[in-house]
Amino acid sequence: MIQHDQRTAVWRRLGTNVIGLTPAEALAKAGADYEVGIVPLVASVPDTLVSAVAGQEMSVAKRVPRKNLTYRLDNGEPIAPVGARYHVVQTKEVLSLVEAMTGAGWQPEFAGTFNNNSAVFMAGKMDMALKTREIDPYLCFVNSFDGSTGVKFACTPFRPFCTNQIRAIFTKRGERPVISLRHTTHILKRADTARELLGLTTAYYRYMDEQVERLLDKVLTEQMLSQALDIVAPIKQDAPDFVRERKEQKRAMLVHTLRTSPTIEDRDRDSAWGLYNAMTELEQWNRDQFPTQAQAEKMFGNHLGMVPMTNPSDRMLRVLTAPYFG
């Protein structure tokens, strides 16, 4: 397992330190202030008739129906194919929204690009105090150019004690509050977006803080621990021996992490919050080497998305917060 003093938050890994800079300065320093163009997508396809006459493989350029291509205007590098109705929103066009959030207490700390320059991001902490002090209230701004999402602000809770990014945590519908604006010509007409975003972010972190406090207060009995283990690492009676052994190892490793990890306070080892953090720690850091660039980008994308709770830590959370648990 990667030791806690060697861990790095994913936005620090992918981005550039921009603390103290304005949003425009942050984008420039991170090399994320480029503009994006869009052109019809053309493919080079084999021309069988000409190839037969020429005696070698020849190709012809053909327009791909209902598809365009985004590309960087500064260097001409292609980014991604998109639909014919896709509208590019330049990052500089939404800077007023970003600046409105900085005026409300959000300060970008890291900025950069990921997924082959198909998205730019800024990540920073909201200026708000949480009672439990277990989570730092981070917010990420993202603008993509590959059609995967629009302009997005996503709550990305971060636990500094173990450098864990907490995904899909403590929500009523299994999603984190995310304002995502599709790339259309109407995107810049939403004057109330900053106010809506601030309200959702504040409400989300207040609600999350309450749930953390409940988990801290929930004493973890042996019966509750066994029940949680049966959810995240169930062992069927008719399972082959090698499957049972693998599951038993996973369960034992989780309990060992709960009892010994230096990132979990001794007072929390018998709490539901301690068990949840042991699960997230194993999920993110139980590896022999740091994630590759591609793995880090995938991890970051998962934390930014509005996705159902499917990871073991997500299933663990559902168990720990269920009314019947305990």
Predicted regions and their residues:
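Ser/Thr-rich, low-complexity intrinsically disordered terminal regions
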Residues: 103-134, 233
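Intrinsically disordered, low-complexity regions enriched in serine/threonine
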Residues: 1-52, 128-326
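N-terminal low-complexity, intrinsically disordered segments
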Residues: 1-114
